[in-house]
Amino acid sequence: MVKRVHIFDWHKEHAKKVEEFAGWEMPIWYSSIKEEHLAVRNGVGIFDVSHMGEFIFRGKDALEFLQYVTTNDISKPPAISGTYTLVLNERGAVKDETLVFNMGNDTYMMVCDSDAFEKLDAWFNAIKRGIEKFGDIDLEIENKTYDMAMFSIQGPKARDLAKELFGIDINDLWWFQAKEVELDGIKMLLSRSGYTGENGFEVYFEDANPYHPDPSKRGEPEKALHVWKTILEAGEKYGIKPAGLGARDTLRLEAGYTLYGNETKEKQLLSTDIDEVTPLQANLDFAIFWDKEFIGKEALLKQKERGLPSKMVHFKMVDKGVPREGYKVYKDGELIGEVTSGTLSPLLGIGIGIAFVKPEYAVPGVEIEVEIRGKPKKAVTVAPPFYDPKKYGAFREE
């Protein structure tokens, strides 16, 4: 069954392209990817990302459980704030990249990828059942994916919009810090976060979903529709644009961010054609707290000892051409890797991408060739982001 977000009907009416993504029928663009992309880089855009997964972990053992099933140290951030962390399998491969918020009172909210929440649901509950065989565990795991609406407001003008709507300056929050706010009586969680490289915030709140898989929980999304329309109306003076998943992908790629399923992944059951990727290969070791035990740690330590089979690197095209997932990467005629993400940068007007290559080439400044339509095209490896961070991005010079 194709999944749909709360205000799918609004998107269906206003978006020029709607199609399935990770099992969800989602808006890809409303006007054009380029127009929406540049609106976020230069002004402000709003994304409906209610297809993202959410879990609530409650109980005295919630923290200990999360410390074991994720890689980072989530014990330090105070309520209410989040930690970027990873869920790994026993082989050290990335099951998903997640954000875990400490909500206080032994309660945590995890935000995960849209195509990972079902397998994570099964994974977490299987681990819990395994623990219960040896004793009691004070832990409740609740999957809130279909109940939670999530909107992402991104761009340099997002700060002005947050001040107007909620009376807060998001620059007073550290990255992933959150506050409980209200909009016209609708209570929600607001976090300084995003997936575009720009400054911005995201809001979470529960509402009825007319497409909920449980018929008893279906209803009209009055809150979600009101919040969406209110933000659009308030943002008109700032040139706000509704933005689809197409622009979200080009924005994250310009920022150099990984995408689950492309840069981070694990082998699926009975599959032999999907390479597994560990956080060491994907330059995500900043999200690993080594002074604790977690699933996959032993495998990562062994990989560190024997060396990496490949490593992630960013590159930009020198010759004309747009790199795409699966294209081969060469160095002096030798096959050294493969592209995992690529696009034509709407901001820079050149081809950019991410590839996994032999580790010795995964440094900036290496001249490589990308095979595009059967022909080698010159490219060079670079350090992310692709744009000038003094002119664009969350920490641009004002």
From Swiss-Prot:
Keywords tagged on the record: Aminotransferase, Transferase
Stretch forming the signal peptide: none
Recorded GO CC terms: glycine cleavage complex
Enzyme class: transferase
InterPro entries for the chain: GCS_T, GCS_T_bac, GCST_C, GCV_T_N, GcvT/YgfZ/DmdA, GcvT/YgfZ_C, TrmE/GcvT_dom1
GO molecular function, a single term: aminomethyltransferase activity
Reactions that this protein is recorded to catalyse: N(6)-[(R)-S(8)-aminomethyldihydrolipoyl]-L-lysyl-[protein] + (6S)-5,6,7,8-tetrahydrofolate = N(6)-[(R)-dihydrolipoyl]-L-lysyl-[protein] + (6R)-5,10-methylene-5,6,7,8-tetrahydrofolate + NH4(+)
GO biological process, one term: glycine decarboxylation via glycine cleavage system
EC number: 2.1.2.10
One Pfam family named in its UniProt record: GCV_T
Transmembrane annotation, as ranges: none
Tree of life domain: Archaea
Family statement drawn from the similarity comment of this UniProt entry: Belongs to the GcvT family.
Functional description taken from the UniProt entry: The glycine cleavage system catalyzes the degradation of glycine.
Subunit structure: The glycine cleavage system is composed of four proteins: P, T, L and H.
Official protein name in the record: Probable aminomethyltransferase
